[in-house]
A protein has these predicted regions:
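Gram-negative outer-membrane beta-barrel transporters
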Residues: 590-593, 613-707
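Transmembrane beta-barrel wall of Gram-negative outer-membrane proteins
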Residues: 256-283, 294-336, 354-371, 434-438, ...
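Flexible loop and strand-edge segments within Gram-negative outer membrane beta-barrel domains
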Residues: 284, 303-305, 323-373, 380, ...
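Short strand-turn segments of transmembrane beta-barrel domains in outer membranes
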Residues: 204-206, 215-223, 234, 238-268, ...
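Membrane-embedded beta-barrel scaffold of Gram-negative outer-membrane proteins
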Residues: 377-397, 522, 529-530, 534, ...
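Periplasm-facing N-terminal accessory domains of Gram-negative outer-membrane beta-barrel systems
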Residues: 24-137, 152, 171, 193, ...
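Periplasmic N-terminal accessory/gating domains of Gram-negative outer-membrane beta-barrel systems
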Residues: 64, 96-97, 104-116, 125-185, ...
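Conserved C-terminal beta-signal and adjacent last beta-strands/turns
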Residues: 319, 668-785
Length: 785
């Protein structure tokens, strides 16, 4: 049955490929003169000719933005299909003076440009830029792009909160989690091209401080065969690149709930070497969303909820030639917090300590012609990575036991967890452009994970209960090959196939072959239309809590079943349009069928989590993005998504006392299902002053109520009786920059939940209930040297 399904999908892919290829005959492809031309450029430092990655490129005509691009790791950029005419190409990079050149495009032309940027003596250019919203849309791929320099969120905001406010279809969830397109934390970080595997299930420690980020590109669909693992979203992070001479930035903030934090980052550029170093700490009396509230007014009661976070990050970049770039990065983060609890159910003075760290080494080497997209050229990327994580959940000796291992309802237990892991891996990719129309890419990613998992329980007398103490060992391997074929400028066909193998305790060797195909049409520079199909294989973390789940289900075989990788069929169609007035609009629809699906289950009253399987998961959604950059002091963006994520059992491998899938009709909305998620942000900037406002709306996550009748499974079936009420909050910020000699001083004020709205964020379902945070104020001062 499985083989016939795969063959059927491959036939569908081949049919799409054949239809696309038949649309343009070889003679037409060779003879037709392309409409418009390409702009290809290189951006260098004027003092040492070093490449300048991440520089922002804008093509304008008559004051209107025609296209945007950014420089890659070698300082190169390309803009395809620019209509014939005269344009101004502008380049901007923090730490350098802006530069621009005039260019004239003819049909079929390919213009090569070189920019030599001059370092600025101060950061003065940051004081006079026009307003920029932090989110942009790539009109060719449809991906959203986040720029840290344009972000005006509260200093205590985490990387996860930035993801939620940046990605269309992302839902705000408790403990800083983010649910993307109805899926539960199934996203993968890539830091400067090197993958960073996910941490321990239940970890609330952020991987890195947002201040180390330069830009992030989010890919929530249309994945090439290169991308495997947890790819509900590929979070492609480019960390800050040292530019110019020595720079240092200091910041400090304080605010509501005894919140305070300090940070420092420094960078320098010495010849072909660049260095960046960052460190920060923060402390707050409200580390997580409160779990207590007045049931009549929904006013949150903040109790036993303090925490501290520490981050360090260092990066060295070496560019020995215009063909080679080496990046070495190291990151360490540590979190300690008290676990909130409801005192009505007894005292549980529990603490959680977490550590996350990674070290990456990446090398890129270019072959062939460096400054032309028409000639044969290639690129080799080799990355090595190390990932460490640990989680210690420690109950107090005086805790009142409160957890029961079903079906025993007479002996309560306290829960203790000590877990750690180490992952070693490599990623190697080779890309070869045969000519302007055809490009191939192939590669492999492999990693080995080892660790130890010590999970135990004790009753009120101190006697040991069920436990699991075992070594962990497993590995993941992924191999792929893909191509991009552009017979004419208005058509691109991307096809590929990947093979994944996942070995984890009790799961054995799980593997899959996954075909993928994306067909894109570019009628002109302002319009993009694409369709996509991809087979997905999403493995779980290499962990083992089966000994505990066996007892928690009273020996039920559903709990002893290993949690297996998620297997998906994913379909997507999208359209992107750039309007003349500086507005970009994206409309996207998607459908995902999973068998099995993956979720996670939390032990009540703790943060201890294990992955679980659902026999089937269905996700349907439509989302739209509007980016507004008309020129002048205002800019903004709107993310709006309507999404339905639901599943059916059996649910295997969790801590459930009853079968949550045993409901009328069999289907139930998942605990991370929220029908409507929307974010709207507006930024005003005039000279040295800025002000911003961001509204966040959610129609409501599940409330944990019993399902008494079959739910609606349509996209517009809101199933309000099993969801909390909708919520809408507004966050605001304002600041002013002062120039004192060569030093920039920027005082800023941030207010989250300006109108102090009271609402339930989520009810108890797969995990506990949480209430929304009350109004908070934070004041921050940045000093840039």
């Amino acid at each position: 049955m499985r083989v016939s399904c795969i063959v059927g999908r491959l036939r569908s892919c081949l049919l799409i490929i054949g239809l696309a290829a038949s649309a343009v005959t070889p003679r037409e492809a060779l003879a037709a003169t392309p409409a418009g031309g390409d702009i290809v450029g290189a951006i260098r430092d004027s003092t040492n000719a070093a490449p300048l990655p991440n520089a922002e490129v804008g093509v304008t005509q008559g004051g209107r933005i025609i296209a945007n691009a950014s420089a890659d790791q070698f300082g190169h950029f390309v803009v395809h299909g620019v209509p014939a005419g005269s344009y101004i190409v502008q380049v901007r990079l923090i730490g350098y003076k802006p530069d621009s050149q005039t260019v004239k495009i003819a049909d079929g032309s390919r213009i090569n440009m070189t920019f030599q940027l001059v370092a600025s003596a101060t950061q003065l250019e940051q004081l006079t830029v026009t307003a920029e919203a932090p989110i942009a849309v790539d009109t060719r791929s449809g991906n959203q792009v986040y720029k840290q320099n344009d972000y005006h969120g509260a200093p205590s905001n985490t990387t996860s909160q930035i993801l939620q406010q940046s990605i269309a279809g992302a839902a705000r969830a408790p403990t800083g989690e983010v649910h993307i397109r109805g899926q539960h934390a199934e996203y993968q970080y890539y830091v400067d091209g090197v993958p960073v595997p996910s941490g321990i299930s239940g970890s609330l420690n952020e991987l890195f401080d947002p201040s180390v980020v330069d830009r992030i590109e989010f890919q929530t669909g249309g994945w090439d065969a290169e991308f495997g693992n947890k790819n509900a979203a590929v979070v492609d992070v480019r960390t800050r690149i040292p530019t110019g001479g020595f720079h240092m930035n200091l910041d400090g903030y304080g605010g509501s709930n005894s919140t305070d934090g300090q940070g420092i980052n420094m960078s320098d550029n010495i010849g072909k070497w660049g260095f960046f170093l960052s460190g920060s700490r923060q402390e707050t009396g409200m580390r997580q969303e409160p779990v207590l509230f007045d049931t009549a007014t929904l006013k949150p009661i903040n109790f036993h909820n303090s925490g501290q976070d520490y981050f360090t990050f260092g990066k060295a970049q070496f560019a020995p030639s215009d063909r080679d770039v080496f990046d070495f990065e190291g990151n360490y983060s540590h979190t300690h917090f008290l676990v909130p609890f409801d005192s009505a159910n007894g005292i549980t003075n529990d603490h959680q300590n977490e550590v996350n760290s990674f070290a990456n080494l990446g090398w890129r080497h270019r072959f062939g012609n460096l400054d032309s997209t028409s000639a044969s050229s290639g690129e080799l990327f080799t990355g090595f990575y190390y990932r460490h994580g640990s989680l210690a959940y420690v109950p107090n000796v005086d805790d009142e036991p409160g957890f029961f291992f079903f079906p025993d309802t007479t002996t309560p237990y306290n829960i203790n967890e000590q877990r750690n892991f180490d992952t070693y891996g490599t990623k190697v990719d080779f890309q070869w452009r045969v000519n302007h129309a055809l490009e191939f890419k192939t590669g492999v990613q492999a990693s080995v994970t080892t660790g130890r998992e010590d999970f135990n329980s004790t009753d009120s007398t101190g006697a040991a209960g069920p436990g699991s103490n075992s070594d962990l060992k497993g590995h993941d391997i992924g191999v792929y090959i893909q191509d991009a074929y552009t017979p004419v400028e208005w058509l691109e066909l991307r096809t590929g196939v990947r093979y994944d193998a996942h070995v984890a305790p009790f799961a054995g060797n799980q593997h899959q072959v996954s075909p993928r195909v994306k067909l894109s049409f570019f009628p002109d520079l302002s319009n993009t239309f694409y369709v996509y199909y991809g087979r997905q294989f999403i493995p779980t973390n290499i962990e083992d809590l089966r000994a505990i789940t066996t007892v928690s289900e009273g020996g039920d075989t559903t709990s002893t079943s290993p949690t297996l990788p998620e297997r998906d069929d994913f379909y997507e169609v999208g359209y992107v349009h750039r309007f003349p007035a500086g507005i970009v609009w994206k409309l996207d629809g998607y459908l995902k069928n999973s068998s099995p699906g993956i979720d996670d289950n939390t032990i009540p009253g703790t943060a201890i989590v294990t992955s679980v399987n659902l026999a089937q998961v269905r996700v349907r959604g439509i989302e739209t993005v509007i980016e507004v950059r008309p020129g002048g002091p205002l800019s903004g963006y709107v993310n709006f998504a309507i999404n339905h994520a639901y599943g059916r059992g059996p649910v295997t491998g969790g801590f459930f006392q009853t079968d949550v899938a045993n409901v009328p009709g069999g289907w139930f909305d998942l605990d991370h299902d929220q029908r409507i998620s929307s974010v709207a942000s507006l930024v005003y900037s005039k000279s040295r002053f800025f002000a911003s406002a961001t509204g966040i709306y959610g129609s409501g996550l599940t409330n944990g109520a019993d399902i008494t009748q079959p739910i609606g499974t349509g996209l517009f079936d809101f199933n309000k009786d099993i969801h909390v009420d909708p919520s809408f909050i507004v966050n605001g910020a304002l600041g002013y920059s002062l120039l004192i000699g060569n030093t920039v001083v920027r005082p800023q004020l941030f207010v989250d939940n300006i109108f102090d709205k009271r609402y339930l964020l989520k009810g108890a379902f797969f995990s506990g209930a949480s209430v929304g945070r009350p109004r908070t104020l934070e004041a921050r001062v940045d000093i840039g040297i």
